[in-house]
Regions:
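A short, hydrophobic coiled-coil helix within the histidine kinase transmitter core
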Residues: 29-33
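Short acidic capping loops at alpha-helix termini that bridge into adjacent secondary structure
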Residues: 8, 40-44
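EAL-family c-di-GMP phosphodiesterase catalytic domain
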Residues: 3, 17-24, 43-58, 70-182
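Conserved functional hotspot residues or short segments at active or partner-binding sites
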Residues: 63
């Protein structure tokens, strides 16, 4: 983040597994990586699937709470398609709820998932979580999600997926073209 190629609001999202969260040294490894890359913990979001929470592993919960104390953000990924109880929303220390793309796909369609998506967004907001919708691929989906109160979106309509090396090139290019205009 030293290079000045991203805004201070830039967030890095990383998927993590139950196995990783169960490792005794996971928190120390995250801290070391943050130091090496000069990224503030507040700019890192770790994404955990509903399936991870189904394991009901006390070691995982201790790790998640330790990461939260460091300032790392947590997201409950693929929400709405698994078998997790709603009590996980209450107990899981999440900052974000990631709405699974299968629910996004049919919003705005006759008999679509608008009521379900709206309810999930309202529930997440009442628990002080922001909502990220996955698989946003049309302008109609994007506009509908805005109307339903969705906070953030991911998908082809928002930005194409890129490899890490390509992202650095794109960000540097964007920064240099902004500097040239000034």
């Amino acid at each position: 983040m030293d290079e000045g190629i991203v805004e201070r609001s830039f967030m890095v999202h990383v998927n993590v597994s139950t196995r990783q969260l169960s490792e005794a040294a996971f928190v120390e490894r995250v801290m070391g990586t943050l130091r090496e890359t000069n990224v503030d913990a507040a700019h890192l979001t770790l994404e955990i699937t509903e399936k991870t929470m189904l394991n009901d592993n006390p070691a995982v919960m201790r790790t998640l709470n330790a990461l939260k104390r460091l300032g790392v953000k947590l997201a409950l990924d693929d929400f709405g398609t698994g078998y997790a109880s709603l009590s996980y929303l209450r107990d899981f220390p999440a900052d974000y709820l990631k709405l699974d793309g299968t629910l996004v796909r049919d919003i705005g369609q006759h008999g679509g998932d608008d009521p379900i998506v709206r309810s999930i967004i309202q529930l997440a907001h009442s628990l002080n979580m922001s909502v990220i919708a996955e698989w946003v691929s049309t302008e109609d989906q994007k506009q509908r999600l805005k109307l339903l109160g969705c906070d953030f979106m991911q998908g082809n309509k928002v930005a194409e997926a890129v490899e890490a090396d390509a992202l650095g090139v794109q960000l540097r290019s964007r920064t240099s073209s902004v500097e040239e205009r000034n």
